């Protein structure tokens, strides 16, 4: 009797989980399916010219596959390509810089205890939890004094000094046995050698998962570019997607699919490292 109740309970939980998965996938399926429809069908559906109801507009399955939108985006919309490279040129330096600084800072907080280190790390956590809206004014003042407004440095520098990587990597480094560090010191290794030859190989999966999360976070930033960048041609792709629905809805779905492609590729490539990183960190 008890086993039957457990099976019923597990089945009920699976049904609920499946329901939420389907709900989460509907917007993605909607975007992908409509990216495969022609311009005429898209315009007729979303400009009210077709005479069909709203529910009929939400059809997920395309009537036929048409790559017209992708062709126009990739070969007839140079603005999309330009903003794509803008986004890549902003995000990649942030990921590299933040992860490198995060490794050094995490090592300092976890293996080089000094007076006030716990309080300083607490400030790191507070800064990580602060939303962008809280720091927008002081950030703007500082960046303006440095002459970085309307330059990519206004986005890259604050991103490099973000605290997420430090917080995430510190949790893992604290669990590394001090005996490894002491043995390396006895062999004559300095701190940089310990980090490069010992800790980085041991933290490889955590570092990769951290880099992936930083990439996904900054790939989709919108408020920072709008605030610190005044020239629209310097905007990243994430800002462009916010206006394309009203300006060029006929290619908006294809732009959204292409925008999601790179983060999806990153997640699929490093899926094992990402899940392993979360699992290891949760155990710490």
Name these PLM-found stretches.
Residues 2-284:
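A structural signal for multi-pass alpha-helical bundles of membrane permease subunits
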């Amino acid at each position: 009797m008890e086993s039957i109740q457990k099976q019923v309970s597990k089945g009920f939980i699976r049904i609920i989980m499946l329901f939420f998965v389907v709900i989460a996938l509907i917007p993605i399926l909607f975007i992908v399916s409509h990216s495969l429809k022609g311009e005429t069908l898209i315009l007729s559906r979303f400009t009210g010219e077709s005479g069909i109801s709203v529910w009929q507009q939400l059809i997920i399955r395309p009537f036929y596959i048409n790559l017209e939108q992708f062709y126009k985006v990739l070969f007839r919309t140079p603005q999309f390509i330009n903003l794509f490279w803008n986004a890549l040129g902003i995000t990649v330096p942030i990921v590299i810089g933040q992860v490198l600084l995060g490794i050094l800072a995490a090592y300092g907080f976890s293996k080089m205890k000094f007076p006030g280190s716990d309080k300083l790390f607490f400030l790191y956590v507070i800064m990580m939890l602060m939303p962008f809206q809280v720091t927008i004014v002081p950030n703007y003042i500082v960046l303006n004094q440095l002459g970085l407004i309307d330059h990519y440095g206004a986005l890259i520098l604050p991103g490099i000094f973000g605290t997420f990587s430090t917080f995430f990597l510190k949790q893992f480094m604290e669990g590394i046995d001090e005996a490894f560090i002491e043995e390396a010191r006895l062999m004559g290794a300095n701190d940089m050698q310990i980090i490069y030859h010992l800790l980085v190989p041991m933290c490889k999966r955590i570092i990769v998962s951290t880099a992936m999360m930083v990439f996904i976070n900054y790939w989709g930033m919108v408020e920072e570019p709008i605030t610190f960048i005044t020239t629209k041609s310097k905007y990243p792709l994430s800002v462009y997607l916010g206006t394309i629905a009203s300006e060029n809805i006929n290619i908006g779905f294809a732009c959204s699919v292409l925008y999601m492609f790179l983060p999806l590729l990153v997640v699929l490539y490093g899926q094992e490292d990402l899940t392993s990183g979360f699992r290891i960190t949760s155990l710490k």
